[in-house]
A protein has these predicted regions:
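Residues located in well-ordered beta-strands
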Residues: 2-4, 16-21, 33, 81-82, ...
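NAD(P)H dinucleotide-binding glycine-rich loop of Rossmann-like/cofactor-binding domains
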Residues: 66-78, 85, 98-173
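Mid-domain Rossmann-like dinucleotide-binding core that forms the NAD(H)/NADP(H) cofactor-binding site
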Residues: 94, 143-216
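C-terminal hydrophobic helical "lid"/dimerization subdomain
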Residues: 272-326
Length: 326
């Protein structure tokens, strides 16, 4: 089968398309034919692993993903595809089922096939288990692959922030994969009033997703006078600072919470994907895809994501089979 291999850490050029052996599922595993995956920020961080191993985060990351090179040379954390073979002890899936999944630190999605356990649990400290369920019938494989990463982080932080109906929520970096998901979940699931911070070029996009107010960070360095927020989600992370981000810290209510996506250890549960599928079927959630690349152009896709200017998600089409969308 074809797979994109990463045998050392570095720039996008370390990603190489190769022919590798097609995996065979064990008794509790399924073989998934991958139709689409996505290039996430986490994929790029792993590929370009730069933290020194003496640094606490660098050491822990080395344990999880590999010190001198990726433990699994096939990166990629999200997929949408079709089950081709099931192990003899698998009970919930059968050949022909269309699924979408988050493979966590198992990675392996930059390939035509992957074996995943029917049910997964952490294998060692810091490991993020895989999660898989049936693909939303109203979505293409590309759309389904696009939404998995955002929900894995957005829902974790919104839950941690105890967001609920009527609260004022501020999302900094609202036009990326995490931000576009957080806007929709905060508005349509939790019933919050949502203020989105993004560039003016993306204002129309985030408003169409449900944002009640939009602040253009390229033109504003302060928040509306007197406005206070119950929850602020920094969907960009601490690596980027600005006067406007500082103002977000200062605009919390007395019991307000500020959370950044680069702090914590998010885990995705099957229940999260089921909630997402429910919102999709009800027309309350949609995928946001910026660009789509073929598997052969993986390095180019990584270069684009590295710019930090993508809107929503960058998707990789792995298999171009026809698919039915109801």
């Amino acid at each position: 089968m074809k797979a994109v291999i990463c045998t050392k850490y570095g720039p996008p050029e370390v990603l190489q398309l190769k022919e590798v052996e097609k995996p065979t599922p064990r008794d509790h595993e399924v073989l998934v034919k991958i139709h689409a995956t996505a290039v996430t920020a986490s994929d790029c961080i792993v590929r370009d692993f730069k933290l020194p191993f003496w640094h606490p985060i660098g050491f822990m990351m080395g344990i999880v993903v590999g010190f001198s090179r990726p433990r699994n040379p096939i990166l990629g954390m999200v997929l949408a595809g079709e089950i081709e073979v099931v192990g003899k002890k698998v009970t919930d899936f059968k050949p022909g089922n269309q699924v979408f999944a988050f493979t966590g630190t198992r990675f392996g999605c930059y390939a035509e096939y992957i074996c995943l356990p029917e049910k997964s649990k952490a294998r060692y400290p810091g490991d993020i288990p895989s999660v898989m369920t049936f693909k939303p019938s109203k979505m293409t494989y590309e759309e389904a692959a696009a939404i998995v990463y955002g929900i894995s982080l957005a829902l974790y932080y919104l839950n941690k922030g105890a967001v609920h109906t009527g609260q004022h929520v501020l999302i900094y970096g609202a036009s990326g994969a995490i931000g576009t998901t957080a806007v929709q979940i905060a508005k349509h699931h939790y019933g919050a009033e949502v203020t989105a911070i993004c560039s003016g070029a993306n204002a129309e996009l985030v408003q169409s997703l449900g944002a009640d107010h939009v602040i253009d960070h390229t033109r504003e360095d302060r928040l509306p006078a007197g406005k206070r927020y119950d929850f602020v989600l920094d969907a960009v992370g601490k690596k980027k600072t600005s006067p406007l981000k500082l103002a977000c810290h200062q605009a919390l209510t007395p019991n307000g919470k500020y959370l950044s996506v680069d702090v914590g250890n998010p885990t995705l549960k099957v229940e999260h994907l089921l909630l997402l599928r429910e919102l999709i079927e009800a027309g309350k959630f949609r995928a946001v895809i910026d660009r789509t690349y073929p598997l052969e152009a993986m390095a180019e896709a990584h270069r684009y994501v590295d710019t930090g200017h993508k809107k929503g998600n960058v998707v990789i089409t792995v298999t171009r089979d026809e698919q039915k969308v109801s």
